[in-house]
C-alpha cells in the first residue's frame, strides 16, 4: 500500500522497451543436469502472462462463467521467484489479476495450512510433493480449508493417487497440472477440470494461443498418434 501511495497521481516514466531485449536469465538443469542459463525476452514473458490470462478465461467459461476464486483471490507462494513458476505463473499473474500473495520463507506443510487458514487463501501452486504433504497435513488435523479452490502442480508428474486424495480431503477444490520449459517462459501444456479428473496422468493440451507441440521419432520425423516419441 505504501508503494502504491508513493506513486499515486504521478505520470508513468516515458521509456521504450525492445520486445526482443533480455528480460531475465533463469537457470535450468535441462537434459544433462548441469545448470544452463536460459535468456528470456520481454516478449516471451508478456506472451506467457497473456496466454495464462486466456487460459484462465477459458477455464471460467468451462465452469459456466463462474469465477473459482471469488472476489478476494489469494495465493500461497511456496516456490522460488527465480523460477518460471514463481516468477510468471504466480508473481506476474498475481499482479495482472490483483491477487494477494503470501510468501513462505521455506516450505513447511504445517505452516502452509496455518497461512491458508489465516489469510483465507484460494490458490496453491507447487511440485506434487508439496501439494501431497499439504493434503496429508490438513487431513491429519481434520481441516477442509474452505477457502482453498485450486491445487495446481508442475515440475514433475503428480501421481494419480495424489489426485484422489485431494478430491477426498478438499472436495471444494479443483486440481490441475502444467508442463513447460524454462526456455519457453514456462509455456507448454495444461491439464485441468474434467480432463484432469478423467486423465490425471496426461500432460494435457497446448496452452492457447501461441503454443504448438509435436512429437517426433528418433530420425526427426513426426510420430503418429499413439506412437512413442520425443
Specify the residue positions occupied by each region the protein language model found.
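Conserved S/T- and glycine-rich ATP-binding loop of Class I adenylate-forming
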Residues: 22, 28-31, 75, 81, ...
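Conserved AMP-binding/adenylation subdomain of ANL enzymes
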Residues: 46-74, 82-122, 137
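Conserved AMP-binding A3 loop
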Residues: 23-51
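Short beta-strand->loop structural element characteristic of the AMP-binding/adenylate-forming
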Residues: 36-39, 77, 99-106, 176
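Conserved beta-loop-beta connector loops within the AMP-binding
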Residues: 214-230
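Conserved pre-ATP/AMP-binding loop-to-beta segment of ANL
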Residues: 8-27, 34, 64-74
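Gly/Ser/Thr-rich phosphate-binding loop
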Residues: 96, 118-126, 135-198, 208-212, ...
Amino acid at each position: 500500500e505504501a508503494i502504491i501511495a508513493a506513486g499515486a497521481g504521478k505520470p508513468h516514466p516515458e521509456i521504450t522497451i525492445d520486445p526482443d531485449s533480455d528480460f531475465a536469465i533463469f537457470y535450468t538443469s535441462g537434459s544433462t543436469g548441469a545448470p544452463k542459463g536460459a535468456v528470456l525476452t520481454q516478449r516471451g514473458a508478456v506472451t506467457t502472462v497473456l496466454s495464462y490470462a486466456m487460459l484462465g478465461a477459458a477455464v471460467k467459461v468451462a465452469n459456466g462463467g463462474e469465477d473459482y476464486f471469488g472476489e478476494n483471490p489469494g495465493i500461497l507462494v511456496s516456490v522460488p521467484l527465480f523460477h518460471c513458476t514463481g516468477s510468471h505463473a504466480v508473481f506476474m499473474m498475481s499482479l495482472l489479476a490483483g491477487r494477494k500473495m503470501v510468501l513462505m520463507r521455506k516450505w513447511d506443510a504445517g505452516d502452509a495450512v496455518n497461512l491458508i487458514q489465516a489469510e483465507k487463501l484460494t490458490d496453491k501452486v507447487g511440485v506434487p510433493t508439496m501439494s501431497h504433504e499439504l493434503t496429508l497435513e490438513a487431513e491429519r488435523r481434520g481441516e477442509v480449508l474452505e477457502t482453498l479452490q485450486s491445487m495446481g502442480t508442475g515440475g514433475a508428474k503428480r501421481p494419480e493417487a495424489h489426485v484422489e486424495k485431494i478430491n477426498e480431503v478438499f472436495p471444494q477444490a479443483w486440481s490441475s497440472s502444467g508442463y513447460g520449459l524454462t526456455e519457453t517462459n514456462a509455456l507448454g501444456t495444461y491439464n485441468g477440470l474434467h480432463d484432469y479428473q478423467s486423465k490425471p496422468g496426461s500432460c494435457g493440451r497446448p496452452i492457447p494461443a501461441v503454443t504448438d507441440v509435436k512429437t517426433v521419432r528418433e530420425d526427426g520425423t513426426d510420430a503418429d498418434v499413439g506412437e512413442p516419441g520425443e
